UniProtKB/Swiss-Prot annotation:
Catalysed reactions, semicolon-separated: D-sedoheptulose 7-phosphate + D-glyceraldehyde 3-phosphate = D-erythrose 4-phosphate + beta-D-fructose 6-phosphate
Keywords for this protein: Cytoplasm, Pentose shunt, Schiff base, Transferase
The protein's name: Transaldolase
GO process annotations (BP): carbohydrate metabolic process; pentose-phosphate shunt
Family (UniProt): Belongs to the transaldolase family. Type 2 subfamily.
Superkingdom of this protein's organism: Bacteria
Native source organism of the sequence: Neisseria meningitidis serogroup C / serotype 2a (strain ATCC 700532 / DSM 15464 / FAM18)
One cellular component term from this protein's GO annotations in UniProt: cytoplasm
């Protein structure tokens, strides 16, 4: 047992933000689950790195190139196999909690980020191809992605809504989720197995703001924003309106803290884990952050501490003329562009 068990007891899941064939086949992922990791996230950048650096893909790439497939079909064949293998490793965890943990995420193509119908069609296809009950389909939280979320939830598909930086957009996502649940209930279908995480990105906010802020606010605003988003979450899912869905089996969306590796070496390497521990949340961490947290992190319910201070820090930031919602829109666009570039790089050797 490690500190991860203590975090789980506080109501937070720690997931690994990484996936590769070697990670699964070496038994390393299974070992991480024994330590207390209870889920996995992937994205185009993670697969691009895996395909480029993991020798276990070489034979399959060569074989797939002999087949009459598009580069994207070759990528999907390998990515789906990796997600299936990770789902198998995480299945015992998933079943031990009645299907509440042990999820593995696979993202739709970044080029679909502004196409709701295209996102729905690809998400359905990928979910069917994986064929595992603990698979989650990752969808960017653009307006189109939030529209797709509603449809996918009504289809009974679990979703990881990603690239959230905005509290306003996050609240829109909760409403879309509730509409999808209501539609499914109205059709007489079960909703208890559907889980959605809202992936709220942390370190990129401080990375964008720290050069413009006074010293006493540096490294504070991303955490303040997350704490405010958690207050929003508590209010939304504590409402009588959602309670009516909950009594019919609906699960609450969980906030997932993403981008929690520290980008600024001046900050403690476990800053974005230690500071954001709270019930009904997830933190997905890169390998280095996971190792650091197991070694010297602190398991304490920090997410509800300093809520007033967080609001004061956000107010001071606004008084400096910084609109965090405008920043959120820019950071989401930047994130989409990064994933598009990673996807292009990933596909290039598969031509």
């Amino acid at each position: 047992m490690t500190i991860l068990s203590d975090v789980k007891a506080l109501g937070q899941q720690i997931w690994l933000d990484n996936l590769s064939r070697s990670l699964v086949q070496s038994g390393e992922l299974a070992q991480m689950l024994k330590q207390g990791v209870c889920g996995v996230t992937s994205n185009p950048a993670i697969f691009q790195k895996a395909f480029a650096g993991d020798a276990l893909y070489a034979d399959e790439v060569a074989a797939l190139k002999q087949q009459d497939l598009t580069p994207k079909q070759r990528y999907e064949t390998m990515a789906v196999a990796d997600v299936q293998a990770a789902c198998d490793v995480c299945l015992a965890e998933h079943e031990s909690t009645g299907g509440k943990t042990g999820f593995v995420s696979l993202e739709v193509s970044p080029e679909l980020s502004k196409d709701a119908q295209g996102t729905v069609e690809e998400a359905r296809r990928l979910y069917a191809a994986i064929g595992c009950k603990n698979a989650m389909i990752k969808v960017p939280a653009t307006d189109a992605g939030i529209d797709a979320l509603e449809t996918l939830v009504s289809d009974g598909i679990s979703v990881n809504l990603t690239l959230l930086f905005s509290r306003v957009q996050t609240l829109k996502a909760y409403a879309a989720y509730a509409r999808g649940i209501a539609k499914r209930l109205a059709a007489g279908q079960s909703v208890a197995h559907i889980h959605v995480v809202a992936s709220f990105f942390i370190s990129r906010v401080d990375g964008a703001l720290d050069t413009t802020l006074p010293d006493h606010l540096k490294g504070k605003i991303a955490i303040a924003l997350a704490k405010a988003a958690y207050q929003d979450w508590a209010q939304y899912f504590g409402s009588p309106e959602f309670a009516a869905l909950e009594t019919q089996g609906a699960n609450r969306v969980q906030l997932l803290w993403a981008s929690t590796g520290v980008k600024n070496p001046a900050y403690p390497d476990t800053l974005y884990v230690d500071s954001l521990i709270g019930a009904h949340t997830v933190n997905t961490v890169p390998d280095a952050t996971l190792k650091a947290f197991i070694d010297h992190g602190t398991a304490k319910a920090t997410l509800t501490e300093g809520a007033d201070e967080a609001q004061a820090q956000l107010a001071e930031t606004a008084a400096l003329g910084i609109d965090v919602e405008t920043l959120a829109a820019r950071l989401q666009e930047d994130g989409l562009k990064q994933f598009e570039e990673a996807f292009e790089k990933l596909l290039a050797p598969l031509v």
